[in-house]
C-alpha cells in the first residue's frame, strides 16, 4: 500500500504525475543508485557508462571529492582518503582500533567515544563521511533524472544494529534526503528477483559484499515476502579477501610495506589480482622487487576459512528458519564478492543447487530498493506487494532475580509492537526501573544492555497490586522504542533505543551461538534464579505479616519457630541447590499455616466487632 500525500488546497500534484524516487545501495566498497523509469528498473550510469560509485571521500586542502576521483587519491594521500566508512559507522573508537589496526587514518575520540578521522578539512565522523557520499549520489541522481527527488530507500546489511541504522539515517538527513525507508540488503535482492521472475517458495539470499556478509532465508508466496530468518557477519567481505591476498604477496616478496602509501598500493594490487583470478586460472603479480604467479587454487586456499565461516552462518540461519537445505528452491547471489568462482562453487555445493546470478550481483540490491522506493513514494498505489522484515535478535526486559523476559522474540516480523504487564515487587513501591536487553540468553549478565529508564509516580500499594504495561515497538527501520505505563494513573515513561556504538562480530556470533551451546546450563540457572525469587517473596510476605500481627496472635515459641524457618531459608537461598530451596519454601509455608489461620480469625473478629447479629445476617 502506498503512502497518501496531503497538500494544501490547489497545491496537489497532478493525479498521474510521476514522483522521482531512487533506491540507494550504500555499500562498503561501492555504492549504486537505481530508479524506475517508464516502468523499467534501471541503475543510473555516469557519462562513461559506469554504475559503481566508489564509497570513498577525499578531503583535500582546497576541495572535497567523492567517488572515482576520490579513489584515485587513495594511494597518493591515504590519511585524507576515507574508504569503507560503512565499517566504522555506529562503532566506538576502541572497537575500531581493535578491529582495524592497519587503517591509515589518524583517529581521535568524540565526546561520546565515537571515532573522528583527522583530515585536512577537520575532524570527520563516519556519519559525516557517509553523508558526503549520499550528497554526491543525490546530486548525481537529480542530474540524471532531471528533477528533485521526492524520497529515497537506502539499503543496510540485515545485521546492522540500532546504532548503525540510526547513524545511517542521520547521515541521510545531513545529506538533505527524505528517507522513505531503510531496507535490508537481502530483502531488496528478494524484491528484485521475486517480482521480476515471479518465483514462489523458500529462497536463500547469500550476500557477500566488500565489508559485510548477510544470509537471509525468505518465503515468497503470491506476492508476499516473508523473511524467515537472518544471519550475518558485520566484518566479513571482499575486503578481507584482499587483506589475506595482500599479506600473502608481501610474504612472497619478503617485503613489509613501510608506510601508508605502500600499504594502499599493496591492497590495490591485491584487489586487481582477485578480479583477474575470477576470469583466469592464474595471473602475474609484481610487487617491490618480486615478480611471480598467483593461481586461483592458491587464492582459494587463502580464502577457504572465510568462505567456510560464511557457510556456518548459513547453516544457523536454516536452523532458525526451521527449514532443511533441500527445501531451498533458489539461491540468490548478491554482492561483488560472489563473482569469485570459489564462492559460487562452495555455495552451490552447500545448498545443492546452482546459485542464481542472472541479475548483476553488484546491481540487484539497488534495483530492489528502487522498486520499493517507487511504491513508497506513491507511484504504484495499486501494488499488492507486502514486505515483512524480522528482528534479528530477541528484545527483552530484566525481571527479578536477574532474569530476562523476552518481549519480542528473534525473527519476529517487523514492524511490530508487543506489550506485557508487570507488577511491583515491594510494598509501597512508587518507581520501577526498566532495563531493555538484547540477546538469546536467560540471564541479564549474558545479554546486551540497550538502555534503561525509570517509571515514577506509581501509586503506593501492596506488592503485586499495581499493574505496569510495558510496550516494545520496532519500526520498519528496525529501531526500537519502549514505553512503560501504570494503568490506573496512566503515568508513563519511554525511551528510544540508540546505543552509543554497534555490536562487534564476536558479540553477534556469541549471541546466536551461546543460546544453543548453553541452553541446558541457562535453563538450570533460570530455574535456580526463579526459585530464589519465590523464596524472597515468601520471606518478605511472612516478615510483613509478623510485623503486623505476629505479636498479637503468636506465642513466643511460635514466633521463634517461624523466625528459625526464615533464617534457614535465607541460608539455603545463598546456595545453588534448587531442590533444597524449594523444600525450604515448603517448610516455611508449613510452619506458618497456624499463623495464617490465626490471622484470618483475627481479621474476622475485627470486622465483626461492635456489630449486631441482625446487621451481619
UniProtKB/Swiss-Prot annotation:
Aminoacyl-tRNA synthetase found in the keyword field: no
UniProt cross-references to InterPro entries, sorted A to Z: ATPase_NBD, Heat_shock_70_CS, HscA_NBD, HSP70_C_sf, HSP70_peptide-bd_sf, Hsp_70_fam, ISC_FeS_clus_asmbl_HscA
CDD domains, per database record: ASKHA_NBD_HSP70_HscA
Keywords, sorted A to Z: ATP-binding, Chaperone, Nucleotide-binding
UniProt function note: Chaperone involved in the maturation of iron-sulfur cluster-containing proteins. Has a low intrinsic ATPase activity which is markedly stimulated by HscB.
HAMAP family: HscA
NCBIfam families, alphabetized: HscA, PRK05183.1
Name the UniProt record assigns to this protein: Chaperone protein HscA homolog
Organism: Actinobacillus pleuropneumoniae serotype 7 (strain AP76)
Gene coding for it: hscA
Amino acid at each position: 500500500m502506498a503512502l497518501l500525500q496531503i497538500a494544501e488546497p490547489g497545491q496537489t500534484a497532478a493525479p498521474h504525475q510521476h514522483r522521482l524516487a531512487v533506491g540507494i545501495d550504500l555499500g562498503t566498497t561501492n555504492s549504486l543508485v537505481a530508479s524506475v523509469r517508464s516502468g523499467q528498473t534501471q541503475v543510473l550510469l555516469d557519462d562513461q557508462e559506469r554504475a559503481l560509485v566508489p564509497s570513498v571521500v577525499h578531503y583535500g586542502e582546497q576541495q572535497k571529492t567523492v567517488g572515482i576521483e576520490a579513489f584515485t587519491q587513495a594511494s597518493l594521500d591515504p590519511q585524507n582518503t576515507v574508504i569503507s566508512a560503512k565499517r566504522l559507522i555506529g562503532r566506538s573508537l576502541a572497537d575500531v582500533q581493535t578491529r582495524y589496526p592497519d587503517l591509515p587514518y589518524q583517529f581521535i575520540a568524540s565526546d561520546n567515544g565515537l571515532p573522528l578521522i583527522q583530515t585536512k578539512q577537520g575532524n570527520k565522523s563516519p556519519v559525516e563521511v557517509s553523508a558526503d557520499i549520499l550528497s554526491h549520489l543525490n546530486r548525481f541522481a537529480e542530474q540524471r533524472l532531471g528533477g528533485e527527488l521526492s524520497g529515497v530507500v537506502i539499503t543496510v546489511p540485515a545485521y546492522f544494529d540500532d546504532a548503525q541504522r540510526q547513524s545511517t539515517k542521520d547521515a541521510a538527513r545531513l545529506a538533505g534526503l527524505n528517507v522513505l525507508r531503510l531496507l535490508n540488503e537481502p530483502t531488496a535482492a528478494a524484491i528484485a528477483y521475486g517480482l521480476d521472475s515471479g518465483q514462489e517458495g523458500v529462497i536463500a539470499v547469500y550476500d557477500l559484499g566488500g565489508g559485510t556478509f548477510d544470509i537471509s532465508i525468505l518465503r515468497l508466496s503470491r506476492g508476499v515476502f516473508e523473511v524467515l530468518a537472518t544471519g550475518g557477519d558485520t566484518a566479513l567481505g571482499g575486503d578481507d579477501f584482499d587483506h589475506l591476498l595482500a599479506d600473502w604477496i608481501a610474504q612472497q616478496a619478503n617485503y613489509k610495506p613501510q608506510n601508508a602509501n605502500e600499504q594502499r598500493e599493496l591492497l590495490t594490487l591485491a584487489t586487481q589480482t582477485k578480479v583477474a583470478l575470477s576470469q583466469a586460472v592464474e595471473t602475474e603479480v609484481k610487487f617491490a622487487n618480486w615478480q611471480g604467479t598467483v593461481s586461483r587454487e592458491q587464492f582459494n586456499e587463502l580464502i577457504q576459512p572465510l568462505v567456510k565461516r560464511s557457510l556456518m552462518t548459513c547453516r544457523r540461519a536454516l536452523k532458525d528458519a526451521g527449514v532443511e537445505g533441500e527445501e531451498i528452491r533458489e539461491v540468490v547471489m548478491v554482492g561483488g564478492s560472489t563473482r569469485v568462482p570459489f564462492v559460487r562453487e562452495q555455495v552451490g555445493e552447500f545448498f545443492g543447487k546452482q546459485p542464481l546470478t542472472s541479475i548483476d550481483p553488484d546491481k540487484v540490491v539497488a534495483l530492489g530498493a528502487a522498486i520499493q522506493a517507487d511504491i513508497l513514494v506513491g507511484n504504484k498505489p495499486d501494488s499488492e506487494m507486502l514486505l515483512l522484515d524480522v528482528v534479528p535478535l530477541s528484545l527483552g526486559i530484566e525481571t527479578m532475580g536477574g532474569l530476562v523476559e523476552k518481549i519480542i522474540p528473534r525473527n519476529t516480523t517487523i514492524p511490530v509492537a508487543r506489550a506485557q504487564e508487570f507488577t511491583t515487587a515491594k510494598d509501597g513501591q512508587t518507581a520501577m526501573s526498566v532495563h531493555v536487553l538484547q540477546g538469546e540468553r536467560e540471564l541479564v549478565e549474558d545479554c546486551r544492555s540497550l538502555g534503561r529508564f525509570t517509571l515514577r509516580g506509581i501509586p503506593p500499594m501492596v506488592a503485586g497490586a499495581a499493574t505496569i504495561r510495558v510496550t516494545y515497538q520496532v519500526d520498519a527501520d528496525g529501531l526500537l522504542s519502549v514505553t512503560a505505563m501504570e494503568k490506573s494513573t496512566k503515568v508513563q515513561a519511554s525511551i528510544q533505543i540508540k546505543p552509543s556504538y554497534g555490536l562487534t562480530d564476536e558479540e553477534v556470533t556469541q549471541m546466536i551461538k551461546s543460546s544453543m551451546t548453553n541452553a541446558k546450563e541457562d535453563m538450570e540457572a533460570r530455574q535456580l534464579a526463579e526459585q530464589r525469587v519465590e523464596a524472597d517473596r515468601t520471606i518478605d510476605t511472612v516478615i510483613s505479616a509478623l510485623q503486623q500481627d505476629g505479636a498479637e496472635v503468636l506465642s513466643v515459641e511460635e514466633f521463634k519457630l517461624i523466625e528459625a524457618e526464615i533464617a534457614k531459608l535465607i541460608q539455603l537461598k545463598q546456595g545453588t541447590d534448587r531442590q533444597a530451596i524449594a523444600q525450604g519454601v515448603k517448610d516455611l509455608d508449613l510452619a506458618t499455616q497456624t499463623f495464617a489461620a490465626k490471622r484470618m480469625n483475627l481479621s474476622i473478629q475485627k470486622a465483626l466487632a461492635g456489630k449486631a447479629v441482625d446487621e451481619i445476617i
